[in-house]
């Protein structure tokens, strides 16, 4: 599971970064989901990097990027749909 966990973790950085650049609402929503999954994969120990207090920022970063994408999604929802 280590190789798959590493791939999911890397996608957890790349996909939310793409969502921040593209500003597409579907990409933003999917980036939130992938960022959250990457956080869970890292915290549960499915990557080669050991989870500790010194590497906590590595786990939180995909989650934070995903939350920014969720904010962009709700901003789009407020502007376009309500």
Curated annotation (Swiss-Prot):
InterPro entries in the record: DUF5493
The protein, known as: Uncharacterized protein A-82
Source organism (scientific name): Sulfolobus spindle-shape virus 1
Physiological role: This protein may be involved in virus assembly.
């Amino acid at each position: 599971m280590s190789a798959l966990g590493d791939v999911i973790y890397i996608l957890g950085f790349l996909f939310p970064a793409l969502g921040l650049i593209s500003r597409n609402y579907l990409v933003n929503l999917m980036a939130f989901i992938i960022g959250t999954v990457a956080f869970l994969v890292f915290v549960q120990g499915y990557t080669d990097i050991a989870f500790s207090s010194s590497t906590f920022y590595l786990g939180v970063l995909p989650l934070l990027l995903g939350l920014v994408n969720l904010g962009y999604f709700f901003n789009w929802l407020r502007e376009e749909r309500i």
